[in-house]
Amino acid sequence: MTSRIELARVDLRGRTPSTAELRAALPRGGVDVDSVLHHVRPVVEAVRERGAAAALEFGEKFDGVVPATVRVPAAELARALDELDPAVRAALEESIARARRVHADQRRTDTTTEVVPGGTVTERWVPVARVGLYVPGGNAVYPSSVVMNVVPAQTAGVGSLVVASPPQANFGGLPHPTILAAAALLGVEEVWAVGGAQAVALLSYGGTDTDGAPLDPVDLITGPGNIYVTAAKRLCRGLVGIDAEAGPTEIAILADATADPAHVAADLISQAEHDVLAASVLVTDSVALADAVDAALTAQLAVVKHAERVRTALTGKQSGTVLVDDITQGLRVVDAYAAEHLEIQTADASAVAARVRSAGAVFVGPYAPVSLGDYCAGSNHVLPTAGCARHSSGLSVQTFLRGIHVVEYTEAALKDVAGHVVALADAEDLPAHGQAVTVRFEALS
């Protein structure tokens, strides 16, 4: 018999905590990346010094397998696609089509502003030249992460893509065949059988494969991973760009008495099954709903495949129910929490959702569960965690673009503003800056 699940409760009714107090009171887990940096730094340094040879040694140590080459042969990509379950292939094709439709509308166009007659500034959008897309192994297989990383990069016009995913002992040192098939379906030709911190380091520094072929370094690394991947990203940031330091997945649900407790429970469980550190948070003004959700969690947990993992996540310090006076207070709570995934299951859900200011993605109403966004909504599921949605966005076409300002001024336009340039340069005690302008209009003495 399954023991009853009762989410820990934080009661904010009748209180008006400050923002700092609110953030401190809310359930929050996360991981301490600093605690593993001393383990990861030697891995990164070894790969920097010895390239693929070091990465393969760490792969043997951590994954228990050494691939014949880091780069997966093209024949293996083709074979994985040929052998892919037809239902999974159809689902991936639908996911790709929807993601491409959404991300196509994110393309940026160059803009030119005439500041003054003869003086223009153009913002030109240029894709990152080469990108490394990390797809984790671990508790599950994530072909959907291949889609979510590759589609915006391709849409942005990135010319060179490499997917890195851990080698699997069960598959002869290759990444999981579903990962390979997804890459092939997207037209990705370069996949590396390397995972963990050593993958991030090899993507950053490059090296030489066992067959002598070059493994070119990338300019940007995206994609989620465990704490060691995150630590390696931190250590390599600057040498390469990174999308974010991803933490455990999280869902917050803002719900009132109109919500179906079975739906709320199912959605909380769906994210809890990712990881024992996953966060599932309910914010509600209805004690009756909170009680009903606890009962529904208990009932559903009895038939969930990964019951122990889910139970551990739901009963961890990162999960719980927050009781509020009303939906307005609930909105303040969810904005302070800044969830990776936020569901709105209230009356007039669209109007409530329009008031949200901090969330990685918002799922509105009873028929937009987070699972839809994970796979087939068309939105991207690589989203900011650990409260970073207060200042950061999810993966998009913009992630893979750089805006370059192109400044063009005629002689007359420069002469017209020269006095202002000189005044500001002198105010900052940088007279050579002003001289670089005036020299164009007067002879040197």
Curated annotation (Swiss-Prot):
Pathway(s) it belongs to: Amino-acid biosynthesis; L-histidine biosynthesis; L-histidine from 5-phospho-alpha-D-ribose 1-diphosphate: step 9/9
GO cellular component: cytosol
Coiled coil: none
Amino acids binding NAD(+): 134, 198, 226
Reactions catalysed, as given in the entry: L-histidinol + 2 NAD(+) + H2O = L-histidine + 2 NADH + 3 H(+)
Name of the protein in question: Histidinol dehydrogenase
Cell wall biogenesis/degradation as UniProt keyword: no
Binding sites annotated in the UniProt record for Zn(2+): 271, 274, 374, 433
Cofactor note as given: Binds 1 zinc ion per subunit.
Annotated catalytic residues: 340 (proton acceptor), 341 (proton acceptor)
The organism's place on the tree of life at top rank: Bacteria
GO MF assignments: histidinol dehydrogenase activity; NAD binding; zinc ion binding
Cysteines joined through disulfide linkages: none
